[in-house]
């Protein structure tokens, strides 16, 4: 009799355990995400859709995900180990980054090199030389640190105001826009500190480049 009672108690506990697991799975894995997605789609439709930025009626990026710009008349972003997941396809459908290396798939993060790692030193040296070649009026000592260092995610869409301003002369020559006009574009796309005290002032690279494209007549509608 005691053995039967023990078996009954065991299976009852097992049933309760599976029941709780199933309920939590449904609540946390289905009900909560669906409810949260539904509420956010109604209250914050743009943010729920990825905070997309539009130009000429089509999505060209997101406010919170950086992308790689290679044209000389566009502002440059911070380094990214995954080139901001920007790639091109050849005739055979093979995907490559802009430097010709194979596309690694959609990724984020960085190489996490130690400061003493020779690979990091070589990467920074190469990036400095590339930047100086594109910005001949700038000296090595004037380059802001964030232009040579990757963000934690490798996808940061912002740079510092100093990093934006130092690129203005070269962009002015390549785009035909005046430095004053470019300075105003940078100011228009500068976001201040949160509540005036948290974080640092930042410049949206995508926002700046969309305004540059609009000023050059490359896009007819700027949808920030």
Regions found by a protein language model. Name each.
Residues 1-8:
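Short, Lys/Arg-rich, polar N-terminal cytosolic tail immediately upstream
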Residues 8, 12, 16, 20, ...:
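Flexible, solvent-exposed loop/hinge segments and secondary-structure transition points
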Residues 162-224:
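Extracytoplasmic/periplasmic C-terminal soluble domains
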């Amino acid at each position: 009799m005691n053995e039967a009672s023990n078996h009954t108690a065991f299976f009852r506990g097992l049933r309760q355990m599976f029941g709780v697991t199933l309920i939590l799975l449904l609540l946390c894995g289905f009900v909560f995400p669906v409810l949260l997605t539904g509420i956010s789609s109604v209250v914050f439709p743009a943010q729920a859709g990825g905070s997309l930025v539009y130009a000429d009626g089509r999505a060209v990026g997101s406010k919170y995900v950086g992308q790689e710009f290679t044209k000389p008349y566009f502002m440059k972003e911070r380094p990214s180990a995954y080139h901001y997941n920007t790639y091109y396809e050849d005739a055979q459908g093979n995907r490559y980054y802009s430097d010709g290396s194979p596309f690694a798939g959609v990724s984020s993060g960085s190489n996490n090199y130690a400061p003493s790692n020779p690979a990091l030193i070589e990467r920074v040296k190469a990036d400095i030389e590339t930047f100086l070649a594109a910005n001949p009026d700038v000296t090595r000592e004037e380059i802001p640190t964030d232009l040579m260092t990757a963000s934690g995610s490798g996808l940061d869409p912002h740079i510092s105001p100093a990093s934006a301003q130092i690129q203005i002369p070269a962009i002015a020559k390549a785009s035909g826009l005046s430095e004053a006009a470019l300075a105003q574009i940078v100011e228009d796309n500068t976001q201040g500190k949160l509540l005036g005290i948290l974080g640092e002032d930042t410049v949206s690279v995508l926002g700046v480049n969309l305004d540059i494209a609009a000023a050059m007549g490359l896009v007819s509608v700027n949808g920030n």
